[in-house]
Amino acid sequence: MSSLHKFKAYFGMVPLDDYEDEYLDEPEPTRRPARPARDSGRDPYHDRDDRDFAEPAFSKAAYAPGRRDDLDDDFDRYESPRHSSRVEPVAVRSARPSASGAVRGSTRGALAVDTRSDRVESRRGPLFDEGGPLSKITTLRPRDYGEARTIGERFRDGTPVIMDLVEMSNADAKRLVDFAAGLAFALRGSFDKVATKVFLLSPADIDVSAEERRRIAETGFYSQK
């Protein structure tokens, strides 16, 4: 039946028999759907997926992690093992032998402390010459981040500051390290590590060499009261 005839039959312009016969014929038997993949135990798309969508070979080098932010790594890098600067009692006994072994054994602890203090004082003399740039150096031992203002004021006045953060928690110590690094950058100074959780803030007009920083760490100047 043509489209025009169908149109006329729909609006009653021609007999409906021909129109109905075509649409009321018995439909052809439908084909039985393919057996589901789960019945055969095989995924019909498995082979095609493997063929068309094969996983590419990735190179580990292309996905190597980048360098972390400097501010996040600063504090972690400062957590290197701390080397003790104490004078061993053996060296003290060999340099200053006692007349009696019994007496030396009974006063061993006191002699070790006194001798260590003498050695520290003797080293501080040539390191911080009177009138030198490090003669007015000061050591601050903050217990929380609230004491950052004191550090900033001392440094702003041109005083070299040693920050001893050993008694602070790691979280507060990291915040104070970030603050001090920004302060040194803003005032064109320098910010250096002396020992584990111990740092030196130097004003712009004071140049502290690597040798001087090493000697500060060896003498344990920051640990003196």
Swiss-Prot record:
GO CC terms, sorted: cytoplasm
Top-level division of the source organism's lineage: Bacteria
Family annotation (Pfam families): SepF (PF04472)
Designated name of the protein: Cell division protein SepF
Database matches in HAMAP family: SepF
Subunit (UniProt): Homodimer. Interacts with FtsZ.
Source species: Rhodococcus opacus (strain B4)
Localisation: Cytoplasm
Biased composition (Basic and acidic residues): 28-54, 77-86, 115-127
